[in-house]
């Protein structure tokens, strides 16, 4: 999960800290989306007459057929390339996105915490959780002279100065497009690098490091939170 969804977070965190990561520890599990929590009598597919459709928060048709932003937010395109009601309905009847969430072969965690210790002494705590109303990123940077809180959904940065007591809120422009404009920006940067012959603003080594941290987090999780020493562990992968 951390590699798939949070390796860019470890990338940004490492850039902010400005130091190599020294140790990683992590805990996480598939706590809820498993057969132990399956409602009694629930069929394998939501559309096979599930008696819990009005009470189950994960009833698939509610998200892909009834949600007002199902198409605009891109949910439907994952289920079916044809966004018509009939096509999506057919895909949910026997496709993977129409299965009961408690009866899938998923082995990916639904919650995970990662602790990072950097060579310069900075420590980081990162939490990934599936159970949240808002799918957003929140960062809280706590320093000796101030604090910065960032909220990706509201596109704001809140800056607090301990010495003066001043509080400043910055509203950041968020471009449209995939990953808040990052997909197009990465392609532009890649093409400019090829055309100019100059190096990229971010190195391949930095990208690899963010992936290694994510892999180390999973290694630690599988070892019940045992701390992974990055300098030694890098030589084994």
Please tell me what each predicted stretch does.
Residues 1, 5, 106, 182:
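Soluble or luminal CAZymes and related metallo-dependent hydrolases
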Residues 2, 103, 196:
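Generic anion/oxyanion-binding catalytic loop in active/binding sites
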Residues 3-32, 38, 42-43, 50-51, ...:
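Oxidoreductase and adenylate-handling cofactor-binding alpha/beta cores
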Residues 28-32, 101-104, 129, 205:
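Short, solvent-exposed loop/turn elements at beta->coil junctions and helix N-caps
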Residues 107-237:
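C-terminal helical cap and adjacent loop that interface with cofactors, partners, or active-site loops
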